[in-house]
Amino acid sequence: MGAVAGRTGGLTVRVADMGDPGVAPMLDGLAAEYTARYGHQAAERELTGTPDAAFSAPGGGVVLVEDGGRAVAGGAFLRKDARTAEFKRIWTDAARRRQGLGRRAMAALEGAAARRGYLRAHLTTGPEQPEAVAMYERLGYTLSSEEGTDPEGRRIYFAFAKDLAAPGERCADPGAGGHSGVRAGGASYD
């Protein structure tokens, strides 16, 4: 069982390992989402392309936002380099979007990565996820102009980066702020 990272608004935020049974709703939700947007083969490639062990301490972790003991949002991180955590498998339950859960998951990922000594976060998302692109931009992530384009300059995926705050600078309630959620393309991860 993972350590409890905090409790806000009736939600529990905790750090876990990929093998934790509480991660299953996140992985199932991601598989369904990726399959619907990119097809079965691409979904399988994305979800099996990184070994689960890469998301384990000391270099990685999984963050779950839970309501009543069930994951409603979350994500994972792993070591990209000594200074940079790569965020992957970022997810919000489709039935719970536009409630600030994506922001909570991202804040929890940033906090967990900073506590492990990372100074920067890197993440990528696909072209069929405009709501994710909008959320990352709103959260202060910078789109890379050097990564994610083909030789002709067409965008094939979106790569983002952000400097992480030191653990003492973290917001006490990552869901606070009164934002109604990021909306783009008729859906939202937030």
Language model regions located:
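Conserved beta-strand in the GNAT
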Residues: V62-L64, R70-R79, E86, W91
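Conserved acetyl-CoA-binding loop-helix of GNAT-fold acetyltransferases
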Residues: T92, R98-G111, R138
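C-terminal "cap" of GNAT-fold acetyltransferases
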Residues: M18-G19, L119-H122, G126-D190
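A short beta-loop-alpha structural element at the N-terminal edge
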Residues: L11-M26
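Active-site beta-strand termini and strand-to-loop segments that position acidic
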Residues: E66-G68, K162-D163
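Alpha-helical interaction/dimerization surfaces of two-component signaling modules
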Residues: L30-E33, A112, M135, L139
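Active-site rim helix/loop that mediates acceptor-substrate recognition in acyltransferases
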Residues: A36-L64
